[in-house]
């Protein structure tokens, strides 16, 4: 059975960069055994944090060859439903985490993250490291 795709959350990229590790190299290792995905929210959150234009261009080059999860009307409806259901149970998460989680669910991906909110989203598997 093939390994599930992985969608790295912004917290993975940012924590790796702060620790002076290259998140793109880590994801390239994962890509040897599974698909690596990105969504628009992650691109925007991470891209805005990159100060160096050369580094931003390098990230764009990597993201452009990853599986892109589109955010169409169905995804927004699923995100709204997820947030509504979580709110009713007293579980409040950010809109951006809900979108990323719904993107991961859409493609059957595991979320690579350091954010505990993803564990609250039904149907989302979240890990803080990959066993490569």
Residue ranges of predicted features:
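A secondary-structure boundary/capping signal
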Residues: 9-10, 42, 114
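Short, well-structured N-terminal submotif of metal-dependent ribonuclease cores
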Residues: 1-38, 48-61, 132
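A generic structural signal for short hydrophobic patches within well-formed alpha-helices
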Residues: 13-14, 43-46, 118-119
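Generic preference for hydrophobic
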Residues: 38, 68, 126-129
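Generic structural signal for small/hydrophobic residues in well-ordered secondary structure
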Residues: 9-10, 46, 79, 104
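Acidic, PIN/NYN-like endoribonuclease modules and their adjacent C-terminal/linker elements
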Residues: 1-5, 26, 101-132
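Active-site neighborhoods of divalent-metal-dependent phosphate/nucleic-acid chemistry enzymes
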Residues: 68-112
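A general structural signal for well-ordered alpha-helical segments in protein cores
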Residues: 24, 43, 56-59, 76-79, ...
């Amino acid at each position: 059975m093939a390994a599930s795709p992985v969608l790295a959350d912004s917290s993975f990229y940012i924590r790796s960069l702060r620790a002076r590790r290259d998140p793109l190299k880590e994801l390239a290792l994962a890509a040897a055994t599974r698909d690596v995905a990105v969504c628009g929210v992650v691109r925007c959150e991470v891209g805005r944090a990159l100060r160096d234009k050369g580094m931003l261009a390098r990230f764009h080059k990597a993201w452009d060859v990853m599986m892109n999860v589109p955010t169409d009307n169905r995804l927004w409806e699923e995100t709204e439903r997820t947030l509504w259901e979580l709110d009713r149970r007293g579980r409040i998460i950010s809109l951006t985490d809900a979108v990323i989680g719904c993107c991961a669910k859409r493609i059957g991906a595991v979320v690579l993250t350091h954010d505990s909110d993803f564990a609250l989203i039904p149907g989302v598997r979240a890990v803080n490291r990959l066993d490569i």
